[in-house]
Amino acid sequence: MQDNRFFILMILLVFSTSLNQGQKLKANDRRSAGLVPYPRIGRNSEISSFSRSERALGLIHQPRIGRSDVSSFDNLNRFHDLSSDADIEFYAMDMDPLLSPDYEDYASKPIALKYADKLQKDNSWLMPDHIHGYKDFHFAQKINDPRLYYSILRDSRNTQGQGGYTPRLGRENERDTANFL
């Protein structure tokens, strides 16, 4: 009975694929999953007939601050037709009323120092303390004492043979590797 069910299932699959015209799937289809060549839901055919405007809206052809090459500004409107002057009138406003006389008076005073102006201008903050001088003279003597310097060097070496314990961090040679395996 099991063989009959399997045989009937195979016949149904073959029959259903023949009804579907047996469309062959391409194995090398490079399109990403989910991307289809037709418009998304909610897009109508009017968008495809929508023509783009030749004029860039909202862009104003004025030189940027700090650019002084006059030859590059000869034909600013060569590619775009600025038929509407409303944009230019909106953005080209007089800046004089925006500046308050109080600010101009304050900026011209020499008393108006910023915090950065009060900082040291030389590179003395990069120098170590012993060049400028120590606040504690005994501390300076300890640092400059050669006996202290050599004792620090002697203590920094591996003291495993002198009773100190240093854990082994890894295999030191090939013999240790062979013994480990």
Curated annotation (Swiss-Prot):
Post-translational modification, as annotated: A pyrokinin potentially constituted by residues Asn-158 to Gly-170 has so far not been detected and might be completely absent in ants.
Location in the cell: Secreted
Skewed-composition ranges (Basic and acidic residues): 169-181
Propeptide residues according to the Swiss-Prot or TrEMBL record: 23-29, 44-54, 68-181
Superkingdom, natural source: Eukaryota
Known tissue expression: Periviscerokinin 1 and 2 are expressed in central brain, antennal lobes and gnathal, thoracic and abominal ganglia. Periviscerokinin 2 is also expressed in the retrocerebral complex (at protein level).
GO BP, sorted A to Z: neuropeptide signaling pathway
Extent of the signal sequence: 1-22
One cellular component (GO) term of this entry: extracellular region
Annotated positions of the Isoleucine amide modification: 41, 65
UniProt KW keywords: Amidation, Neuropeptide, Secreted, Signal
Region (Disordered): 159-181
Function description: Periviscerokinins mediate visceral muscle contractile activity (myotropic activity).
The protein's name: CAPA peptides
